[in-house]
Protein backbone atom coordinates (compact mmCIF):
# COMPACT_ATOMS: atom_id res chain seq x y z
CA UNK A 1 0.00 0.00 0.00
CA UNK A 2 2.87 2.39 0.80
CA UNK A 3 4.47 1.76 -2.59
CA UNK A 4 1.31 2.99 -4.29
CA UNK A 5 1.68 6.40 -2.60
CA UNK A 6 5.43 6.60 -3.12
CA UNK A 7 5.33 5.38 -6.74
CA UNK A 8 1.74 5.91 -7.94
CA UNK A 9 2.60 5.19 -11.57
CA UNK A 10 4.50 1.96 -11.00
CA UNK A 11 7.95 3.42 -11.64
CA UNK A 12 9.70 0.71 -9.62
CA UNK A 13 8.59 -1.90 -12.17
CA UNK A 14 9.37 0.16 -15.25
CA UNK A 15 12.43 -1.32 -16.96
CA UNK A 16 12.60 1.56 -19.47
CA UNK A 17 13.48 4.17 -16.85
CA UNK A 18 16.07 1.91 -15.22
CA UNK A 19 17.60 1.19 -18.62
CA UNK A 20 17.68 4.93 -19.39
CA UNK A 21 19.26 5.80 -16.04
CA UNK A 22 22.04 3.28 -16.68
CA UNK A 23 22.53 3.85 -20.42
CA UNK A 24 22.86 7.66 -20.43
CA UNK A 25 25.85 7.85 -18.04
CA UNK A 26 27.57 4.98 -19.86
CA UNK A 27 27.19 6.69 -23.24
CA UNK A 28 28.40 10.00 -21.76
CA UNK A 29 31.50 8.41 -20.26
CA UNK A 30 32.28 6.54 -23.49
CA UNK A 31 32.00 9.75 -25.55
CA UNK A 32 34.29 11.61 -23.14
CA UNK A 33 36.88 8.81 -23.35
CA UNK A 34 36.69 8.77 -27.17
CA UNK A 35 37.14 12.55 -27.23
CA UNK A 36 40.16 12.30 -24.96
CA UNK A 37 41.75 9.61 -27.14
CA UNK A 38 41.14 11.33 -30.48
CA UNK A 39 42.08 14.94 -29.64
CA UNK A 40 45.50 16.42 -30.26
CA UNK A 41 47.22 16.94 -26.95
CA UNK A 42 49.89 19.42 -28.08
CA UNK A 43 49.30 23.05 -27.17
CA UNK A 44 52.42 24.28 -28.94
CA UNK A 45 50.48 26.09 -31.66
CA UNK A 46 50.78 29.82 -30.98
CA UNK A 47 47.73 30.61 -33.12
CA UNK A 48 45.45 28.98 -30.58
CA UNK A 49 46.07 31.75 -28.07
CA UNK A 50 45.60 34.58 -30.59
CA UNK A 51 42.33 36.10 -31.75
CA UNK A 52 40.60 34.76 -34.85
CA UNK A 53 40.24 37.42 -37.52
CA UNK A 54 38.40 35.69 -40.38
CA UNK A 55 41.54 34.04 -41.70
CA UNK A 56 43.87 37.03 -42.07
CA UNK A 57 46.50 38.59 -39.88
CA UNK A 58 45.41 41.85 -38.33
CA UNK A 59 47.35 45.06 -38.87
CA UNK A 60 47.00 46.19 -35.30
CA UNK A 61 46.26 44.77 -31.89
CA UNK A 62 42.77 43.28 -32.03
CA UNK A 63 42.29 43.01 -28.29
CA UNK A 64 41.08 46.48 -27.49
CA UNK A 65 40.17 47.50 -24.00
CA UNK A 66 36.65 48.40 -23.00
CA UNK A 67 34.95 49.39 -19.81
CA UNK A 68 34.08 46.74 -17.25
CA UNK A 69 30.73 48.50 -16.81
CA UNK A 70 29.41 46.83 -19.95
CA UNK A 71 30.11 43.38 -18.53
CA UNK A 72 28.57 44.42 -15.22
CA UNK A 73 25.39 45.56 -16.95
CA UNK A 74 25.19 42.28 -18.86
CA UNK A 75 25.55 40.33 -15.62
CA UNK A 76 22.95 42.49 -13.88
CA UNK A 77 20.57 42.07 -16.82
CA UNK A 78 20.46 38.29 -16.41
CA UNK A 79 18.42 38.03 -13.16
CA UNK A 80 15.88 40.57 -14.34
CA UNK A 81 15.50 38.79 -17.67
CA UNK A 82 14.94 35.51 -15.84
CA UNK A 83 12.42 37.29 -13.64
CA UNK A 84 10.38 38.20 -16.69
CA UNK A 85 10.34 34.63 -18.00
CA UNK A 86 9.36 33.37 -14.56
CA UNK A 87 6.40 35.75 -14.34
CA UNK A 88 4.91 34.65 -17.68
CA UNK A 89 3.27 31.45 -16.33
CA UNK A 90 1.67 33.52 -13.57
CA UNK A 91 0.00 35.79 -16.10
CA UNK A 92 -1.52 32.80 -17.88
CA UNK A 93 -2.93 31.25 -14.71
CA UNK A 94 -3.86 34.36 -12.71
CA UNK A 95 -7.56 33.48 -12.76
CA UNK A 96 -7.01 30.11 -11.04
CA UNK A 97 -4.46 31.26 -8.45
CA UNK A 98 -6.51 33.96 -6.70
CA UNK A 99 -4.98 35.69 -3.63
CA UNK A 100 -2.59 32.82 -2.85
CA UNK A 101 -0.92 33.25 -6.23
CA UNK A 102 -0.63 36.98 -5.64
CA UNK A 103 1.27 36.40 -2.39
CA UNK A 104 3.58 33.94 -4.14
CA UNK A 105 4.21 36.52 -6.87
CA UNK A 106 4.97 39.25 -4.31
CA UNK A 107 7.27 36.87 -2.44
CA UNK A 108 9.07 36.27 -5.73
CA UNK A 109 9.24 39.91 -6.85
CA UNK A 110 10.16 41.56 -3.55
CA UNK A 111 13.83 40.45 -3.45
CA UNK A 112 14.27 41.41 -7.09
CA UNK A 113 12.78 44.87 -6.56
CA UNK A 114 14.95 45.41 -3.48
CA UNK A 115 18.01 44.25 -5.43
CA UNK A 116 17.22 46.65 -8.25
CA UNK A 117 16.86 49.56 -5.81
CA UNK A 118 20.21 48.65 -4.25
CA UNK A 119 21.83 48.58 -7.72
CA UNK A 120 20.47 52.04 -8.47
CA UNK A 121 21.67 53.43 -5.11
CA UNK A 122 25.16 51.94 -5.60
CA UNK A 123 25.21 53.35 -9.15
CA UNK A 124 26.14 49.94 -10.49
CA UNK A 125 24.32 50.60 -13.76
CA UNK A 126 25.58 54.16 -14.24
CA UNK A 127 27.82 54.66 -17.29
CA UNK A 128 29.87 57.83 -17.59
CA UNK A 129 29.95 59.65 -20.88
CA UNK A 130 33.29 59.47 -22.64
CA UNK A 131 33.02 62.51 -24.90
CA UNK A 132 33.40 66.14 -23.93
CA UNK A 133 30.12 67.75 -22.85
CA UNK A 134 30.95 70.97 -24.74
CA UNK A 135 30.97 69.19 -28.10
CA UNK A 136 27.54 69.57 -29.70
CA UNK A 137 27.93 68.00 -33.15
CA UNK A 138 30.41 66.12 -35.29
CA UNK A 139 31.55 69.30 -37.06
CA UNK A 140 32.28 71.05 -33.79
CA UNK A 141 34.01 67.86 -32.62
CA UNK A 142 36.32 67.96 -35.62
CA UNK A 143 37.02 71.67 -35.08
CA UNK A 144 37.52 71.07 -31.37
CA UNK A 145 40.16 68.40 -31.99
CA UNK A 146 41.89 70.38 -34.80
CA UNK A 147 41.28 67.72 -37.42
CA UNK A 148 40.13 69.96 -40.28
Swiss-Prot record:
InterPro entries, A to Z: NADH_UbQ/plastoQ_OxRdtase_su3, NDAH_ubi_oxred_su3_sf
Membrane spanning residue stretches: 19-39, 70-90, 99-119
Known EC number: 7.1.1.2
Gene Ontology MF, one: NADH dehydrogenase (ubiquinone) activity
Any single Gene Ontology cellular-component annotation: mitochondrial membrane
Main subcellular location of this protein, as a coarse class: mitochondrion
Keywords: Electron transport, Membrane, Mitochondrion, NAD, Respiratory chain, Translocase, Transmembrane, Transmembrane helix, Transport, Ubiquinone
Membrane topology: Multi-pass membrane protein
Protein location: Mitochondrion membrane
Keyword Electron transport: yes
Record's catalysed reaction(s): a ubiquinone + NADH + 5 H(+)(in) = a ubiquinol + NAD(+) + 4 H(+)(out)
Family per record: Belongs to the complex I subunit 3 family.
Summary of the function given for this chain in its UniProt record: Core subunit of the mitochondrial membrane respiratory chain NADH dehydrogenase (Complex I) that is believed to belong to the minimal assembly required for catalysis. Complex I functions in the transfer of electrons from NADH to the respiratory chain. The immediate electron acceptor for the enzyme is believed to be ubiquinone.
Protein name: NADH-ubiquinone oxidoreductase chain 3
